[in-house]
Amino acid sequence: TINDLKTVTTDHKGQAVTITKDSKIVVRYTAKLNDQAVIGSTGNSNTASLIYSNDPNSTGGGSKGETPKDKVAVFTYQVVINKVDQDKQTPLKGAGFTLYKKDATGKYTKVTEIAAGETTTFTFKGLSAGDYKLSETQTPAGYNTIADVEFKISAEMDRTSDNPTLKSLTATATSTNKLTFTSNITDGSLTANVVNKKGSILPSTGSIGTT
């Protein structure tokens, strides 16, 4: 229920607003998902309707009606990174990752960071569609740090249904260093293995060598 509605007399250009019986009124609002949001195909539903009266006073006794309920859903996703040895199977401890998302200006801003520890699986929850960058900020001892991985999360929803559903979910690498993601629409997960290799990185021409 919205209780703090304001009287509108002019639009955003300062022009007088005239409302007739044929006027179409659109109410827009924003909301932020919290840590209790459901991840995956179930989505987070929101139902809206308008109760109206032919009496202009909110406390009046005129007849009332209600518009048909309109249901929408907001979907959120998770990226799951499995850290593995160069055999591409053995879990590898000692890594830490930071996930960034590209904003409207094209700049990457930090979403969250997971520090190194005993875990070999890193789960980044509460993500939306968009462009991301994964950086290995801590590397297992004796292994080479991987290059940053940039990828794009894309999703399609059935927006016209009375029960909105998630139709597709993909993540595609957009950088030279590529990851292959496996998608699971049900739990909203995009999973990839990140491989670390042992040894020294060969120096570039003219640079100081490593041992």
State what each model feature region is.
Residues T1-T211:
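Solvent-exposed loop/turn and edge beta-strand elements of beta-rich ligand-binding domains
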